[in-house]
Amino acid sequence: MYDYIKGQLTKITAKYIVVETNGLGYIINVANPYSFTDSVNQLVTIYLHQVIREDAHLLFGFHTEDEKDVFLKLISVSGIGPTTALAIVAVDDNEGLVNAIDNSDIKYLMKFPKIGKKTAQQMVLDLAGKFVEAPQETGNTKARSNKAGNTQLDEAIEALLALGYKAAELKKIRAFFEGTSETAEQYIKSALKLLMKG
């Protein structure tokens, strides 16, 4: 198992980042790849969780140990796999997640992709009281000026599709943001907040 990786961030895609260390490039699945935009070609430290499957060895990466801890708690719930947990972590609203779990807010939990009523109930059952204090806000929240526009919105929509959101939902999101100028990271964060409001 790996705890973290320190290396040069060499590539960002809608689903993952690539970190090079000792001549090897590691594909790391992350909640919001575009939150790493300012770190391209720089030394980064990414906290890791490794999933070994019959057909693949997957790495899931996080900005902070708190973010990783939330992910690990989520995958301990029956019915939640790493991809679904990553989509939940991507919302970047751990306080809302913790409140929903502690207050048995099944409706809120069902807004996450691939979370049905049974899984939401299981989350409440398994995780109520497990979050001693709400984790720090995750991700890189620095505001930045970046060339934006439709390309950035396209990248954000692609990343949201990779997280499991439906194209029909994202069509409304695209229409909402059309004509605005943000970074892909900002579009993703704003879109996730809108998707959670329903």
UniProtKB/Swiss-Prot annotation:
Positions of the UniProt region annotated as Flexible linker: 143-147
Domain remark text: Has three domains with a flexible linker between the domains II and III and assumes an 'L' shape. Domain III is highly mobile and contacts RuvB.
Taxonomic lineage: Bacteria, Bacillati, Bacillota, Bacilli, Lactobacillales
Domain of life according to the entry: Bacteria
Recorded name of the encoding gene: ruvA
Coiled coil: none
Residue segments, region Domain II: 64-142
Function in brief: The RuvA-RuvB-RuvC complex processes Holliday junction (HJ) DNA during genetic recombination and DNA repair, while the RuvA-RuvB complex plays an important role in the rescue of blocked DNA replication forks via replication fork reversal (RFR). RuvA specifically binds to HJ cruciform DNA, conferring on it an open structure. The RuvB hexamer acts as an ATP-dependent pump, pulling dsDNA into and through the RuvAB complex. HJ branch migration allows RuvC to scan DNA until it finds its consensus sequence, where it cleaves and resolves the cruciform DNA.
One GO location term (cellular component): cytoplasm
Annotated family: Belongs to the RuvA family.
GO molecular function, one term: four-way junction helicase activity
Protein's name according to its UniProt entry: Holliday junction branch migration complex subunit RuvA
Listed InterPro entries: DNA_helicase_Holl-junc_RuvA_I, Hlx-hairpin-Hlx_DNA-bd_motif, NA-bd_OB-fold, RuvA, RuvA_2-like, RuvA_C, RuvA_C_sf
Record localization: Cytoplasm
Keywords: Cytoplasm, DNA damage, DNA recombination, DNA repair, DNA-binding
Main location: cytoplasm
GO biological process, one term: DNA repair
